[in-house]
Design a protein with these regions (language model features):
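EAL-family c-di-GMP phosphodiesterase catalytic domain
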Residues: 1-106
């Protein structure tokens, strides 16, 4: 069983509490990511939460990576994470999924 928490901000439950409940992935809320290029404190918060999750075996998913600069800021400092955002693929229609996956796997 995989338990994923969506829209995580770190405000209501700690990462340690989520681990106690068997959470295996945390999808960080876009609001945490969107200003990491503007505010050092936002970047440091994302780095801390992502590393803390990764260190105890929860896979962080950083949602809303839209620019190369955002990715560069997190790629070496956020532990073992997954990234999602327009930098990698824009939203697509379900009917386009197979075609898009085939193009990505070439």
């Amino acid at each position: 069983v995989t338990i994923i928490v969506d829209h995580y901000t770190g405000n209501k439950l700690s990462i340690e509490q989520l681990k106690q409940y068997g959470v295996t992935k945390i999808k960080f809320d876009y609001q945490l990511i969107k200003n990491i290029t503007l505010y050092k404190s936002d970047l440091e918060r994302v780095q801390y939460l992502s590393r803390a999750a990764s260190d105890i075996g929860i896979k962080p998913v950083l949602i809303g990576i839209e620019t190369p600069l955002q990715y560069d800021l997190v790629k070496d400092t956020c532990g073992d994470f997954l990234a999602q955002g327009e930098l990698f693929c824009s939203p697509i229609e379900p009917s386009e999924l197979i075609t898009t996956l085939n193009k990505m796997n070439r």
